[in-house]
Amino acid sequence: MIAKHIDDILKSPSNGVIRKMFEEGAMLKKQFGEDKVYDFSLGNPDLDPPKEVLKAIKKYSKEKTQGCHGYMSNAGYQSAREAMAAKTKKEQGIDVPWQNVVMACGAGSALNITMKALLNAGDEVIVPCPYFTEYDHYIHNHNGEIVRVKTKEDFSLDAQAIKDALTEKTAAVLINSPNNPTGRIYSDDEVKALADVLKEWGDKTGRYPYIISDEL
């Protein structure tokens, strides 16, 4: 017997929908030919990695330094964390100490780690609709509850709708930009309006919900 919550996930209609579509697409391509099947499931890149990346991988795969392929810090290599902190400062003007940067293997891993760190049982995470369906599982994996809110007609964030959905159990608001599946990119003004709503709520209640931003 497996854990009930895992059994519930496996039986859920939304479980792995995108992966199921991908597998179905692969089968149909074999049956009818790749040129006759349009796959809108996984967000596989259309372009190959830059040559510089491939060169670096080849270089480090031949690295002879003792221990270079051993275990690393749980948060990732310092050089990678420093590079990400510098990138954030350059692109967003935010001075993030590299010690505050944690590397993860993909967004799914990063979001699960984040939910584990933030959620107590029964805490709520507000998610604007439509959204990436795996968010349901990322939140439920850590005993949280997803609270769905509508966006505006153009799929922009509706700060008032999010404000109306806030409760004493709200731990975070999870946004995704560019949004999957709409492609909407949230503007600075939208995100600032959301931040203002959450700060106002925190000033009032003493609990400041986090903004979790899943970005590409």
Predicted regions and their residues:
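Basic/polar N-terminal segments that are highly enriched at the extreme N-terminus
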Residues: 1-6
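N-terminal small-domain helix-loop-helix segment of the aminotransferase-like
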Residues: 7-106, 113
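Conserved core of the PLP fold type I
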Residues: 66-206, 212
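Walker B catalytic acidic pair
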Residues: 215
